[in-house]
Curated annotation (Swiss-Prot):
UniProt xrefs under InterPro entries: ExoRNase_PH_dom1 (IPR001247), ExoRNase_PH_dom2 (IPR015847), ExoRNase_PH_dom2_sf (IPR036345), KH_dom (IPR004087), KH_dom_type_1 (IPR004088), KH_dom_type_1_sf (IPR036612), NA-bd_OB-fold (IPR012340), PNPase (IPR012162)
Species lineage: Bacteria, Pseudomonadati, Pseudomonadota, Alphaproteobacteria, Hyphomicrobiales
Gene3D superfamilies recorded: GHMP Kinase, N-terminal domain, K Homology domain, type 1, Nucleic acid-binding proteins
Protein name: Polyribonucleotide nucleotidyltransferase
Catalytic activity reported: RNA(n+1) + phosphate = RNA(n) + a ribonucleoside 5'-diphosphate
Length: 717
């Protein structure tokens, strides 16, 4: 019934098995990949023909994690998987980015790749094996795809590169880098690092590419026995149309791209495009030689040619800069004084307002992943409204691009954040992109660094980011610093680098062509370093290090530690005690399992009141100390005073006042606030208190004069 084929190799010390022919046989391509004991199913389906009028390649990648893969049941009311998590969205992008450039130009059939995590061994991250499985499914499908690709994760532990480290090894690694590519070239890099130098990062990319070569060989071996017949696809030849268009539009298009201001340049380009359409699609012609989609596609290709030729020939760019110059930068902090920290970062026509908010442990994000529930104390959210590019558009929940850009900036900043023990705050940063003309994610990195320093968060060092581009034709190439939006769309590489003056903290690279050599990547990294250092210098004009104190409106957090066996007493039955403390003091209180207590409030008085209350519950009263208390009961022989949390003690009638007392109620009544001194404990462990040795007005001890009896004892010497 089944015609199965499989290959198995040893990869980084674990078995990798690729199998096809048994599961999902109605898909164009399907591969079940097993790495260690992590199992993923990748399927691909592509429509037999493009939709009418389709003018782009509609590729969708869906990565999904099933909770049964880790032996769990989903939370929530419905108890089933819902909308994609942030991690699922990020891995979907991770798979999409290296495979998208390998579909031929002109292929516009609706194509969907679905990768499902079926089993997770909690040792091997499923993202890399999902990339491998998707590549294998595409290679077997017969769909026009210039693969296969391989992918690998690289760690850097004790000065050594590690291929596909286990999940528990990543805690020791100063690098988390995922690289994907073909046998000849790198296509995608995504990484987070702890201030590593450029040569170490480049070495990791090369190490990773070498590391996934056995995987590509295995996919090719499987394809030799299991691949479907390739689909026929003959891209249309538009060279004649392009030459004709070049003849009538080249000069005007070149002049349009000499305009440095974005809006004016776009208007000039649109005018040329309208003229071209009018020429090739004159009104009244029923069956024109070319469709509007063909003319638009060829015109876009012509734009790219003119921009690229100009850069390679003149070393001058669209906005007049040379290859290495960064656009003018203006940095401001304290833009929104009632927020905890804020910054405005403007680089050319790209601008971000970034706001930092400090919270408590209650504000931490709970993340439910296949590896278990964990709490995240740093969140970074990136918003890209349509007005930032002068357009109208959809508003609502963030899209994949916004989630991906936010995570890139998050990776860049996180290594510089203080440890929770040093700075026990939850941090949320929001980047509002208000203008965009290239590299808004790197503007977010810079703005986040500024806003956190403005908020008083003790960053180890400021962080800046820069986007690099590449134009390559045959042996000629130009590496561009701080690319514009057009240079991103029309170029061959988008290479984002973020870090401090000492090293790289985050790197993301997407390459659209083959042939990017180690030499070119090295040039780009070193050129990016110069740009990054320049940007850090410009940022320092606004603020160069974190403020010494938090903003006026930020909450204060005081940390105290209590014995673990006292946690129950502080919380109380059903949370009664801690609720009372919160209600009466106004402070927020978070108690962790190890006895760490975080008390938060914008008022120092509220924090101190809560701290004293908790201290009174967990601490033992000390003999000789003076405490404030409340009379809770009176009797003929004295008064009972609640003086130390829930602890009561007796003030004998002889200790109520220095003079003789006939009746307890002559001195105190229930509810009275009094000062008492702990004199000691009787033979049964009962507390003995005294009021007469304490000045009831000031709470200070009364010093007995010479010859007077002290504390009810013998006369002092």
């Amino acid at each position: 019934m089944f015609e199965t084929h499989k290959v198995e190799i040893e990869w980084a010390g674990r078995p990798l098995k690729l199998e096809t022919g048994k599961i999902a046989r109605q898909a164009d391509g399907a591969v079940l990949a097993t790495y260690g004991e992590t199992v993923v199913l990748a399927t691909v389906v592509s429509a037999k023909a493009p939709k009418p009028g389709q003018d782009f390649f509609p590729l969708t990648v869906n990565y999904q994690e099933k909770t049964y893969a880790a032996g769990k049941i989903p939370g929530g009311y419905f108890k089933r998987e819902g909308r994609p998590s942030e991690n699922e969205t990020l891995v979907s992008r991770l798979i999409d980015r290296p495979i998208r450039p390998l579909f031929p130009d002109g292929y516009k059939n609706d194509t969907q790749v679905i990768v499902t995590v079926m089993q997770h061994d909690l040792e091997n991250n499923p993202d890399v094996v999902s990339m491998v499985a998707a590549s294998a499914a595409l290679t077997l499908s017969g769909i026009p795809f210039m693969g296969p690709i391989g992918g690998a994760r690289v760690g850097y532990i004790n000065g050594e590169y590690v291929l596909n480290p286990h999940l528990d090894e990543m805690d020791e690694s100063s690098l988390d880098l995922v690289v994907a590519g073909t046998q000849e070239a790198v296509l995608m890099v995504e990484s987070e690092a702890k201030e590593l130098p450029e040569d170490v990062m480049l070495g990791a990319v090369v190490f990773g590419q070498q590391g996934f070569q056995p995987v590509i060989d295995a996919i090719i071996k499987l394809a030799e026995v299991a691949a479907k017949e390739p689909r026929e696809f003959d891209p249309e030849d538009h060279s004649a149309l392009e030459n004709a268009m070049l003849a009538i539009a080249e000069d005007e298009l070149r002049n349009a791209y000499k305009i440095t201001e974005k809006a004016a340049r776009y208007a000039a380009v649109d005018a040329v495009k309208a003229k071209v359409k009018e020429h090739f699609l004159p009104e009244g012609i029923e069956n024109p030689a070319h469709t509007a989609e063909e003319i638009g596609s060829v015109f876009k290709h012509l734009q790219a040619k003119i921009v690229r030729w100009n850069i390679l020939d003149t070393k001058s760019r669209i906005d007049g800069r040379d290859l290495e110059t960064v656009r003018p930068i203006v940095s401001e902090v304290g833009l929104l004084p009632r927020t905890h920290g804020s910054a405005l970062f403007t680089r050319g026509e790209t601008q971000a307002i970034v706001v930092a908010t400090l919270g408590t442990g209650e504000d931490e994000q709970y993340v439910d992943s296949l590896t278990g529930m964990y709490k995240e104390r740093f969140m970074l959210h990136y918003n890209f409204p349509p007005f930032s590019v002068g357009e109208t558009g959809r508003m609502g929940s963030p899209g994949r691009r916004e989630i991906g850009h936010g995570k890139l900036a998050w990776r860049a900043i996180r290594p510089m954040l203080p440890e929770a023990e040093q700075f026990p705050y939850t941090l949320r940063v929001v980047s509002e992109i208000t203008e965009s003309n290239g590299s808004s994610s790197m503007a977010t990195v810079c703005g986040t660094s500024l806003a956190l320093m403005d908020a008083g968060v003790p960053l180890a060092k400021p962080v800046a980011g820069i986007a690099m581009g590449l134009i390559k034709e045959d042996e000629r190439f130009a590496v561009l610093s701080d690319i514009l939006g057009d240079e991103d769309h029309l170029g061959d590489m988008d290479f984002k680098v973020a870090g401090t003056e000492a090293g790289i903290t985050s790197l993301q690279m997407d390459i659209k062509i083959e042939g990017i050599t180690e030499e070119i990547m090295g040039i780009a990294l070193n050129q990016a370093k110069g740009g990054r250092l320049h940007i850090l210098g410009e940022m320092a004009k606004a603020i160069s290090e974190s403020r010494g104190q938090l903003g006026e409106f930020a909450p204060r957090i005081e940390v105290m530690n209590i014995p673990v066996d006292k946690i129950r007493e502080v919380i109380g039955s059903g949370g009664k005690v801690i609720r009372e403390i919160v209600e009466k003091t106004g402070a927020k209180i978070n108690i962790e399992d190890d006895g760490t207590v975080k008390i938060a409030s914008s008022s120092g008085k509220e924090i101190e009141a809560a701290r004293k209350w908790i201290h009174s519950i967990v601490a033992e009263p000390e003999v000789g100390q003076i405490y404030e208390g409340t009379v809770v009961k009176t009797a003929d022989f004295g008064a009972f005073v609640n003086f130390f949390g829930a602890r009561d003690g007796l003030v004998h009638i002889s200790q109520l006042a220095s003079e003789r007392v006939a009746k307890t109620t002559d001195v105190v009544k229930e509810g009275d606030k009094v000062w008492v001194k702990l004199m000691g404990f009787d033979e049964r462990g009962k507390v003995r208190l005294s009021m007469k040795v304490v000045d009831q007005a000031t709470g200070k001890e009364v010093v007995a004069e010479k010859g007077e009896k002290k504390d009810g004892g013998e006369a002092a010497e």
